[in-house]
Structure formats: structure tokens, C-alpha cells
UniProtKB/Swiss-Prot annotation:
Classification of source organism: Bacteria, Bacillati, Actinomycetota, Actinomycetes, Mycobacteriales
An example Gene Ontology biological process: regulation of glutamine family amino acid metabolic process
Protein encoded by which gene: glnE
Family: Belongs to the GlnE family.
Cofactors named for this entry: Mg(2+)
Organism: Corynebacterium efficiens (strain DSM 44549 / YS-314 / AJ 12310 / JCM 11189 / NBRC 100395)
Identification of the protein by name: Bifunctional glutamine synthetase adenylyltransferase/adenylyl-removing enzyme
Length: 1050
């Protein structure tokens, strides 16, 4: 006889159990089968129930909680268990709500298990706002309170109280229960109402397939509005308890209005969230302050954190203020972020009329905040602080504050509201989703973009809600990817199912990744694409900003000159040409990248100039369209460095070098020495010296563009930049000298062979191969007569060649200048331009001063006749590296000269703390210190016969002449000051040594130095810290331990 509980059928000789296995039901627990049998569900009649169970977020948790409920009910009476079981079988909607709740929220399941009689509430629809008010207020026996405020003269005034006898509205009530009893009643009622809302919400993301059916999905805005209504009701009851605690049965002698802020104010509250509030009291005396404080304490003890930190002056400000005091504060003292917070303000409970008066008075100020001078800087600083508060390791898991997170959407939407809401009152709405919809409807953002963002935002909020519901705790952090169990639960509770070999968790991960990427691109979608649509030809029904709205938006996005910026956009993207259409497609993304630079105005202008310069190059726009990295790099350069921008605009073909090759950035594929060889070879093909110098300029321009671009993109170190700049100068000098010699010997009226060999000796930074962008070429010329040529005739010929080269290089052009400076030669500017080795030797032996000998420490051959240059260097070694080292008199003289430099050379009005060359602990301090150490120890250590500051520092550290910490301090300061000096040239387009004060110009320098432009204050602090430490080492090493006494002796 067949077992009636297990029907079987024979299939090809095998017996198949028609009941699903626990594995098929997604049950992992070893007790699952036994639990199902205990419930009476392990039978054919219960198959729908088992499949329903398998749809829960965590079926094992749901099963465990269900068993506990049955056990509790059975302990009460068999009939109680049977009633629940029959309702589960008969009522599909209830079944889904119950199982979705038990498998989606452990905390809510625990509440239901502890109070099993509440299960019948899950058969009902969602409580209305009025019903929630009634439930919360009835839980503490509330009735409308008598509010009779007393003014400063002691006069009583009757005011309207929106509290009602049927307990369905916000207002000022008085509770019967107080203390612990009240808190217990409030907590229970609040948790029960939340449980009902959660069950309906979770049932809406329950999986729907052939084996089970979900319930209607509850719209996100409906969920958040219900939760906000619940918070309103809960805090209205908390205020009733506070009234009794402060006043007892006496009339309330103050009007107290509670303004909801943040998500609660916008009626888009989470399940578990702080509720931000602001209090207005009339009068604001000690009792109204006590009432507000008791309200906060009761709310925090019973429901959630109630936070009044958004009030004027924050936590240090008065807890309650009069309306007049609020108005005065917002008119005079409020910061931009405080007006941004007021976007969400809403009268919540207490005196609703006073709350509305607050909104009427303060609200208009919100819509003028975007006109404040500091608005853009404030907005950027607020966003930066948000990101800084998220640890790097959590930025991809944080739903709220991380990359592509909720705050990105909220921040962007609020910015658009504040910019355009001044003139467009339809934007004066509180909730993010409603604001996004209005932005779409009014044409501020594209319809598709806007709707995609709404969906993305609501999806992130859904995940946030599910995470919070699980333990009823405030959280915004996703589980780690490797936490498969929690990822699986979250995915299932959020409505994801596995398919095609992909698990539900994987499906959720992929969708989340897409959403984050979409949100990360929202600045292009929300801010820049509408701007472009305002200047291109569109159909009348297409989304399009007005010209005035577009200019307003440009100003809010950081453009200092929005009218000009709009003109640039019009010039670039208007018209019907193919190029204009491509520009209109590209510019939203390009402008997003420009917005991350220190000077987007200049960047947009430079892009317009470059587009004009590259007009006949068909590949230009195509490359920007197809190779995103080219556009991104180009915008960083154009918005950061006028110096580099001009180089690129003059050589548009260079843009192709900003892409990637097979081994990485193309900018790094070209070795500096190969560039120099190519430069010399190209110049050598020209007999005309003017054309030769023109060719040298052109190739130098390309190399400067390459080095500066790589520098701005953080692809080269400071040493690599300086070395590359030095090599190209060497090549220009060598090629130019050869060109002049060719020209001199080609003249029929002059000798056809050179009358002298000429060598160019690099001095200063050129000699040390440490040139910056703004450095001149300090040189000396050495000549040697050709065999059989009179010395005077040879020197005169060499002088004419060298002077001709200098003047030809110095001719004005659109390129960075090519100044050759002879100021370090013997006798300075009054000395001979060219000398023989013997003449130099005689001069240094008889008349050479200490400063001239010190200058020789950096002398090296850079161009011309190498053999002659080598002999010259060997000759001067006895002067710069004397056998016994520098004399005491020379050391005293060096220190005396340095003291004069410190006291006299700093330009009038310069800041000694931030002057990169002559400032405290800056380049001059470090280089003089290194040169003094060379003079003292080079006779003992041949490794110090080196012209490079950094390489000498390495040697003095290795030899123990200074300790490693001192060497590292000087090294870091030299690199920092050199990078800052280079950045100044990149930003100003000419040589500069003084860092600007904090502000926009310093932000530009910080950006060029590799820092985030918004972090210009941190950049300045770093510079000051590094140079301060450097100065301390200079005091110890250059001046001696007793530096004050050392200088006094001078």
C-alpha cells in the first residue's frame, strides 16, 4: 500500500520523490528537513509553501524563525498554531509578507517571534499617516496640550494648536505615561509599525516565477514617505512625553516647533537613520530649552538618534532660538552648507504654524546662497570633506559616501537646485527623486539621463534599506565581496535571482558596478550635456537650457567668467557641421575633466584655441572621441598650465603623443638623448643659421611640451624633468654653435676653416644638469686657436661666433626664451666673452675671488669641442678642489656672502617663508650648504667632484659627513622647492620664485605640482613643513651648531 504522505511514481525503473530537496529549496541547515517535517510541510499539499519559503532572502533564517513562532503559539494553544498555519496556506499575500519578513530581517523576525499575536497585522495593508499618529500617541495616553506662551512682559497669549482629539495630526500633546514606561511603550509601538511597513516592502522584492508569486512592489518614494510619516508620529509622541516631563499638568508656556531636516525633512527617510532637527521657540527660555532636550532624550532612547547639530553654530550654539534669532543668524553668519541643509527643512511637529513662519522667513535666503562669492569654493570643499571622511578601503563598499554613491547624486541635485531655484520655483522641492524629476521636466537635464539616475539612486537606497533592516542598525556599507553568505542574502532580499549560471550575488554585483559607473559620470550628464544642448540646434521639444540658465550653471560649476565660457561653447559646438556635432558630443565629458583642474576658464579657452589650430587635422576630434585617455590628459594640461598649453597650441600634432602605446604612455617612449641627437641632426641640415635656429626652436618646443606634459601628468620625477630640460638645452647650444661656425666659414669674405676650437662650459643649474623650466643657460666660452692662427685673431673670431649665436638665440619668438647668460665668467659682465684655457688659469690663480671659485663647483662641458672642454675642467680642478681643501678664509667668505644674500637679495615684498629660491630652507640654502661641504671635503673624497646637488648629497651621506636624516631632509626640501619653482613657471608662463598666497592662484600651482588643486592649503602646509625642517639642517651644517654666534663673527 502506498504511503499517503509520499506519493511516488516509477520512471524507468527508478522511484522519484516529487518533493523538492532541501538543496533545491536553497536550505543549507542540516536540520532543515526535520524542521519542515515538524511544521507539517514535508508533503505534496505543502509544496507551494516550501517553494514560498525558498524565496525568502535567507530561507534557513526564515525557517528557523517560523519554527520558533509555531512553538510559541503551540505553547499557548494548539488552536493558535493551527490558525497561523491555515492562514499561511490560504492567504498567499500574507504568506509572502511573513516569509519575506522572516528571511529579510533577523531583528524584525525576533520582534514577531517575541510577540506572536502581531502576525495578524501582516494581513492588513499599510497603516496610513493618521493611523500611525494615533497608534504612537495612544501608546502613551496622549491628549492635546494647552499651550499658553508668556511673552517678555509676562502677558499670556492664546495660540492655535494643531493637535487633535482623534490623535491623527502633528502638534503639541501631553502624555499620560512618562519615564521608562513611556519609552517601553513607544519603542514597542514604533517597532511594530516598522515591522508592518518592512513586511510590505520586502514582499515587493520577493522573487516572482512559476513556483511562487511576489506581491506588488512598493515604490521607493512610498517606502520613504511612510518611514518619514512614522518618524513624524513617533517624535510627536516623544514630544508629548517631554511636555509632561517638563510641565506636568500645567499649561505649556512656550511655543516649540520642531523642524525636520535632512532625509526626514525631505520625507525620504531610511529605516534606520539619524533624524536631524532644528528647534524654534517663542519665547526661548530655560523651560523651552529643557523641553527640547527632553524631546531629544526621549527620541534617542525610544527610536533613533535625534540630532540637533544642524542648528545655528552647531553643537556649540543654543539648543533653541526664537524666530528672530534664527533670521538674524542666517542673514549674517550662516555658511553655504547651512543653506544647503535648509533645502530639506520641513515643519515636523510641535507648533506647526511657528514652523511655517520659520520656513517663510528663512526659505528665500536659500535661493540666494548661490550668489555668494564663496559659493563654488564652499561646495567643492564640502564634497572634498565628504570623500576624505571615507577610508580608502571602504570607498567601493560605501553606498552613501563612496565612489558613485548616494551622496554624489544628492550633492549634484542640490547644487542644481540652488543654482536654478533662485529663478525657477518649481525646483523648490525637498526630496532628491522629486527634484530629479522636476529637473527632467523643466529641461535642466536629459530625460533619459535623469530617469537612469533616478533608477540608480533608488537601487542604492534599496540596498541601503535591506542592509539596515537585517539587524535594524544604521549602516551604508556593503558586505565584502568574499562574504558570499551575506552577499547572497542581500541579493535575494533585494529581488535578484540567479540565472544562466550566474548566482544572485553575482548578478547584484554586476548591476551595482554599472550603477556606480553611471553615477560617477553624472557630472557630465547633469551639468555639462545640458549646457551644450543650449548652444546647439535642437528640435523644439528637446531638453535645452536657456542662455541665462546655462550661464548661471557655468558660474556655479566653477567658471569665473561664465559669459566668456558660454561664448567658447557656442563657438565650438554651434552649427551643423560634422565637427560641431562631434564637439557637442565630446564637450560634456571634456568639461567634466576640465572641472577637476584649477582653472577651467583658461582650460576651455585653450581648448578652443587648440581646436582652431587643429582645424585641418581630421584625426584630432576623432582621437579625442575614440581614445578617452587623450582627452582626459589634454584637459588636465589645458586647465592647469598656460605654459604647456601654448606649446601644444603651437604644435597641434603633439596631441597624438598623449595617447598610450604598446608599453604605456607615449610620452615616455622617447628617450631624451634620442631627442637631442635628432635635434642636432636636423639643425645640421641647414646652412642658413636663422633657419637652423628656427629648426632647433621647433624641436625644442616639442621636447618641452613632452616633458611638461609628462610632468603635469605625474609621469616623470623632478630629477627626470630637470635632466631632460638640461639635455635639450645642451643640444640647442651644441647645434646653434655648429650652425654659427658653418655660417662663418661659408662666407667667401672670411676664412673657410674655423680659426679656433670653441667649447661651451655649463655653469649653475645647467652645469649640474638641474635646469628648471624658467632657467637661463649660464655658460662660459673657452677657445683655442687653430694651428698656425694668431691668438688674438682666433679669439676675436671666436667672440664674433659666440656673440652671434647668443643674439640669434635671444631673438623674440613665441617659444620660451633662449637666454645665454655669461654673468659667471671672470670679471663678470665686464670680462671677456671668450678666453683661452691659459687666460682662465691665470685669472683664477691671480685674481679669482671666492664666489668665482665656488661657481666653478658646477662647471661642466655641455657643448662644442669636448676635448677642449675636458682640458679646461682638468685645469680648474686645482682651484675648485684644492689639495688641502678650502682655507678658513674661504669658508668665512662663503658664509659672509651667504649672510649678504639672506639680508639683501630677497626682492622687496617677498615672503621669506614661501620664496622657492631665496626663502628659508629653500634652494639657495640647500645648494650653498652642499657647495660648502664640497669645498670642505672634496680633497678627501674624489666622489665629491660632482656638479649635481642631489648626487653630492648622496655622497656626503654615504661618507658620514652628515647623518642620513639631515641628508634626507635637504633632499626632500630641494625636490619640493624645485617642483614648486617648476610649477610656478608652468602656471605663470614665465620664471617666478614666489608662491602665491592661499587662493585660486595657489590652487593652480598645487595642481601643477601634482596635488589636488582643492588641497592647496595642504600643499602649502607641506611646503612650509619641509622647508622649515631644511632650514634647521642648514643652521646645523652650514652655520655650525651655534649658528647665531657663527653669523655674529662675520
Amino acid at each position: 500500500m502506498t504511503d499517503p504522505l509520499i506519493h511516488t511514481r516509477k520512471v524507468m525503473g527508478f522511484v522519484r520523490d516529487p518533493l523538492p530537496t532541501t538543496g533545491a529549496l536553497s536550505l543549507k541547515s542540516t536540520n532543515a528537513r526535520a524542521d519542515l517535517e515538524w511544521l507539517g510541510w514535508r508533503n505534496v499539499e505543502s509544496i507551494p509553501l516550501m517553494w514560498a519559503l525558498s524565496g525568502a532572502g535567507d530561507p534557513d533564517v526564515a525557517l528557523n524563525q517560523l519554527v520558533r513562532m509555531y512553538q510559541t503559539l503551540e505553547s499557548q494553544s494548539p488552536q493558535a498554531r493551527e490558525e497561523l498555519d491555515q492562514r499561511i496556506r490560504a492567504d498567499e499575500a500574507f504568506r509572502v509578507r511573513l516569509l519575506a519578513l522572516l528571511g529579510g530581517s533577523s531583528a524584525m523576525g525576533d520582534h514577531l517571534v517575541a510577540n506572536t499575536h502581531l502576525w495578524e497585522l501582516l494581513t492588513e495593508e499599510a497603516p496610513t499617516r493618521a493611523e500611525m499618529f494615533t497608534a504612537m500617541l495612544e501608546s502613551v495616553g496622549a491628549t492635546p496640550a494647552e499651550v499658553v506662551p508668556v511673552d517678555d512682559e509676562g502677558e499670556e497669549r492664546q495660540v492655535a494648536n494643531t493637535a487633535t482629539e482623534d490623535l491623527t495630526t502633528p502638534g503639541t500633546y501631553r502624555a499620560t505615561l512618562t519615564g521608562v514606561d513611556a519609552e517601553r511603550a513607544l519603542r514597542f509601538t514604533y517597532r511594530t509599525l516598522m515591522m508592518r511597513l518592512a513586511a510590505l516592502d520586502l514582499a515587493g522584492t520577493y522573487p516572482n516565477d512559476a513556483r511562487r508569486r511576489s506581491q506588488p512592489r512598493v515604490e521607493f518614494t512610498t517606502v520613504t514617505r511612510r518611514l518619514s510619516n512614522l518618524a513624524d508620529a513617533a517624535l510627536t509622541a516623544a514630544l508629548a512625553v517631554a511636555v509632561t516631563g517638563v510641565y506636568g499638568q500645567k499649561p505649556v508656556d512656550a511655543r516649540l516647533s520642531v523642524m525636520a531636516m535632512g532625509k526626514c525633512g525631505a520625507q525620504e527617510l531610511n529605516y534606520i537613520s539619524d533624524v536631524d532637527v532644528i528647534f524654534i521657540a517663542e519665547p526661548a527660555h530655560s523651560r523651552s530649552t529643557r523641553l527640547a532636550a527632553e524631546f531629544i532624550r526621549t527620541g534617542c532612547s525610544s527610536f533613533f538618534e535625534v540630532d540637533a547639530a544642524l542648528r545655528p553654530e552647531g553643537k556649540s550654539g543654543a539648543l533653541v532660538r526664537t524666530l528672530e534669532s534664527h533670521i538674524a543668524y542666517y542673514k549674517r553668519w550662516a555658511e553655504t552648507w547651512e543653506f544647503q541643509a535648509l533645502l530639506k527643512a520641513r515643519p515636523m511637529t510641535g507648533d506647526m504654524d511657528l514652523g511655517q513662519a520659520y520656513l517663510d522667513a528663512i526659505g528665500p535666503m536659500v535661493w540666494t546662497a548661490s550668489q555668494r562669492d564663496s559659493f563654488v569654493d564652499d561646495i567643492q570643499a564640502m564634497r572634498r570633506r565628504v570623500l576624505e571622511n571615507v577610508p580608502e578601503e571602504l570607498r567601493d563598499r560605501e553606498l552613501k559616501l563612496g565612489r558613485g554613491g548616494l551622496r554624489d547624486v544628492e550633492f549634484a541635485v542640490q547644487l542644481l537646485q540652488m543654482v536654478h531655484g533662485r529663478y525657477d520655483e518649481t525646483l523648490r522641492v525637498r526630496s532628491t527623486v522629486e527634484a530629479l524629476q522636476v529637473l527632467v521636466d523643466q529641461g535642466y537635464i536629459g530625460r533619459e539621463d535623469g530617469h537612469n539616475l533616478i533608477e540608480s539612486y533608488e537601487f542604492l537606497r534599496l540596498l541601503e534599506h535591506r542592509l539596515q533592516l537585517e539587524r535594524v542598525k544604521r549602516t551604508h556599507t556593503m558586505p565584502k565581496v568574499e562574504d558570499r553568505m551575506n552577499m547572497r542574502w542581500l541579493a535575494r532580499a533585494s529581488g535578484f535571482t540567479g540565472s544562466g549560471g550566474q548566482s544572485s550575488a553575482r548578478a547584484m554585483e554586476h548591476h551595482l558596478r554599472r550603477v556606480r559607473l553611471q553615477i560617477q559620470s553624472l557630472h557630465s550628464q547633469l551639468f555639462y550635456r545640458p549646457l551644450l544642448n543650449s548652444v546647439v540646434n535642437l528640435s523644439v521639444d528637446a531638453m535645452k537650457l536657456s542662455q541665462e540658465a546655462a550661464k548661471l550653471q557655468l558660474g556655479a560649476l566653477g567658471y569665473q567668467h561664465p559669459v566668456r565660457a558660454y561664448e567658447h561653447l557656442t563657438a565650438l559646438a554651434s552649427g551643423t557641421s560634422r565637427k560641431a556635432k562631434i564637439q557637442a558630443m565630446l564637450l560634456p565629458t571634456l568639461m567634466e575633466w576640465l572641472s577637476q583642474t584649477a582653472d577651467p576658464d583658461a582650460g576651455l579657452l585653450n581648448y578652443r584655441k587648440l581646436s582652431d589650430a587643429a582645424y585641418d587635422r581630421s584625426w584630432f576630434l576623432r582621437m579625442l572621441r575614440d581614445e578617452g585617455v587623450v582627452g582626459q590628459r589634454l584637459m588636465r594640461i589645458l586647465g592647469t598650465s598656460p605654459y604647456t598649453s601654448e606649446l601644444i597650441i603651437a604644435t597641434p600634432d603633439f596631441v597624438s603623443e598623449l595617447g598610450d602605446g604598446t608599453t604605456g604612455p607615449k610620452l615616455l617612449e622617447t628617450a631624451p638623448d634620442r631627442v637631442c641627437k635628432a635635434l642636432k641632426a636636423t639643425v645640421a641640415r641647414h646652412d642658413d643659421p636663422d633657419r637652423a635656429i628656427q629648426a632647433a626652436r621647433s624641436l625644442r618646443r616639442q621636447e618641452l611640451a613632452r616633458v611638461a606634459s609628462a610632468d603635469l601628468l605625474n609621469l616623470l620625477t623632478v630629477q627626470e624633468v630637470c635632466h631632460s630640460l638640461s639635455l635639450v638645452w645642451d643640444a640647442v647650444l651644441d647645434a646653434a654653435l655648429e650652425a654659427e661656425i658653418r655660417a662663418a666659414t661659408a662666407d667667401p669674405a672670411k676664412p673657410d676653416e674655423p680659426l679656433a676650437a670653441i667649447s661651451v662650459i655649463g655653469m649653475g643649474r645647467l652645469g649640474g644638469a638641474e635646469l628648471g623650466y624658467g632657467s637661463d643657460a649660464d655658460v662660459m666660452f673657452v677657445a683655442e686657436p687653430a694651428p698656425g692662427v694668431d691668438e688674438n685673431e682666433a679669439i676675436a673670431w671666436a667672440i664674433s661666433v659666440c656673440e652671434s649665436m647668443r643674439s640669434r638665440l635671444a631673438k623674440p619668438s613665441g617659444d620660451p626664451p633662449l637666454e645665454v647668460d655669461l654673468g659667471l665668467r671672470p670679471e663678470g659682465r665686464s670680462g671677456a666673452v671668450v678666453r683661452t684655457i691659459e687666460s682662465y688659469e691665470n685669472y683664477y690663480a691671480k685674481w679669482g675671488e671666492t664666489w668665482e671659485v665656488q661657481a666653478l663647483l658646477r662647471a661642466s662641458w655641455v657643448a662644442g669641442d669636448r676635448e677642449l672642454g675636458t682640458r679646461f675642467l682638468e685645469t680648474i680642478d686645482k682651484f675648485r678642489y684644492p689639495a688641502g681643501g678650502a682655507s678658513d678664509a674661504q669658508i668665512r667668505e662663503v658664509r659672509r656672502m651667504k649672510a649678504r644674500v639672506d639680508n639683501e637679495r630677497l626682492p622687496r615684498g617677498a615672503d621669506r617663508n614661501t620664496h622657492t629660491k631665496l626663502g628659508r630652507g629653500a634652494l639657495a640654502d640647500i645648494e650653498w650648504t652642499v657647495q660648502l661641504l664640497t669645498m670642505l671635503h672634496a680633497h678627501e673624497h674624489p666622489e665629491l667632484h660632482n656638479t649635481s646637488t642631489l648626487e653630492v648629497l648622496e655622497v656626503v651621506e654615504e661618507k658620514g659627513i652628515i647623518n642620513p636624516l639631515q641628508a634626507q631632509t635637504l633632499r626632500e626640501a630641494w625636490l619640493t622647492a624645485t617642483a614648486a619653482r617648476n610649477a610656478l613657471v608652468l602656471v605663470k608662463g614665465k620664471r617666478a620664485d614666489q608662491l602665491p598666497p592661499p587662493g585660486r592662484h595657489l590652487a593652480q600651482v598645487a595642481g601643477a605640482a601634482g596635488w589636488d588643486p582643492d588641497e592647496y592649503q595642504e600643499y602649502l602646509d607641506h611646503y612650509l613643513k619641509v622647508t622649515r625642517k631644511s632650514r634647521q639642517v642648514v643652521e646645523e651644517v652650514f652655520w655650525g651648531l651655534d649658528s647665531v654666534e657663527a653669523r655674529r663673527e662675520l
